[in-house]
């Protein structure tokens, strides 16, 4: 009984000591406590993380006023608020890659529609025609297999350059020494030696890539909304319609009969 009482007193004393330590603003680890249950140490780490991310963003091309109408970093979803530098590096690598693919896609989209009858083009003797969104299904066997191999080789090369071994802390992370987007592919020697010129060129690439991503999405949606009408057909129709409508307004003001009928958009889906 005496032993039990002694143990209870020790427990009470221990709890009292803990309360006094916590009341003094310290935990056993020595970190100061703040309101909300966080410690000063964790708050300082969070502040350092935010500062590191903001400082890193300031070094990236395409994140300043030189890249567009937005002042500083355009981040409407506040993704950078909870990100690390590693996250930002991975996002930038993704943006560069998707921008480059989109630039090729936007060019190929309109070229494929305009060169469908060109003998040297991959049109399989005229079997590939019409809207670009329909041409995917018209491609015959013998094309996709080499393309898949080429894409696999290109991606393997890109991964070997920039991505860390996907084990432990290296999973889904880029190599620290990797220069984002630099695949050492410059057959024409266009890469400038001057850092300012290089940054300007990188910003232009980013802006063109961003525009291309929006453009290719718009191309697809436009052709889905207007079946059978190719992109250039829609463009030329819009220009022609605007011109005819302006002429019609002028003729009405002058009391003249209309000279041209308002064009209608053809539907080639049938």
From Swiss-Prot:
Cofactor detail note: Binds at least 14 chlorophylls (8 Chl-a and 6 Chl-b) and carotenoids such as lutein and neoxanthin.
Residues noted as binding chlorophyll a 2 in the record, renumbered to the chain: 98
Alphabetical UniProt keywords: Acetylation, Chlorophyll, Chloroplast, Chromophore, Magnesium, Membrane, Metal-binding, Phosphoprotein, Photosynthesis, Photosystem I, Photosystem II, Plastid, Thylakoid, Transit peptide, Transmembrane, Transmembrane helix
GO annotation, biological process: photosynthesis, light harvesting
Residues that span the membrane, as ranges: 96-112
FT transit peptide: 1-47
Top-level taxon of origin: Eukaryota
Binding site for chlorophyll b 1: 56
Induction annotation: By light.
Membrane topology: Single-pass membrane protein
One MF annotation (Gene Ontology) recorded for this entry: chlorophyll binding
Binding site for chlorophyll b 4: 158
Binding-site residues, chlorophyll b 3: 155
Positions bound to chlorophyll a 5: 204, 222
Entry comment on modification after translation: Photoregulated by reversible phosphorylation of its threonine residues.
Residues found modified as N2-acetylarginine: 48
Assembly mode: The LHC complex consists of chlorophyll a-b binding proteins.
The protein's role, per its UniProt record: The light-harvesting complex (LHC) functions as a light receptor, it captures and delivers excitation energy to photosystems with which it is closely associated.
Protein's name according to its UniProt entry: Chlorophyll a-b binding protein LI818, chloroplastic
Species per Swiss-Prot/TrEMBL record: Chlamydomonas moewusii
Gene expressing this chain: LI818
